[in-house]
Amino acid sequence: MNRNDLDRRLRELSIYSDFYYRKELKALVQLIGDGEQLNCVLTGVHEGNRKMLAVTDRRLIIIFAAALSAGDIKVIRREAVSEYRFERKLLFSKLSFSTSSGASFEFTNTQGSLKALFEWAMQQPLPEMD
């Protein structure tokens, strides 16, 4: 995927104006594989830092793009997510999910307006593997 393709997909999801300037997108362009479909992007505070969470048809990708130090990327296969919960509040919405291996993730101060998009992205069928 190149940046033009990413920008086009963000527009299709109606979230381009919320994220077009985020420095995490540079890493996301390199991480999304051929044929992989981006379905949701949101940001929130995870482990004390503001991070981006991208949901594709195959994976959840957590990106931390630090200004003065090395960033951090975590990739979770979508089929490994055993449960998720998105608590939408007027302010300070929270997303949490856990994996079948027992790992837990929590994003606070996230965009409550993206709850429906996140849930839609998580409900999309996993692609067939050859």
Regions found by a protein language model. Give the residues of each.
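Acidic, Ser/Thr- and proline-rich intrinsically disordered linker/docking segments
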Residues: 2-33, 43-48, 66-130
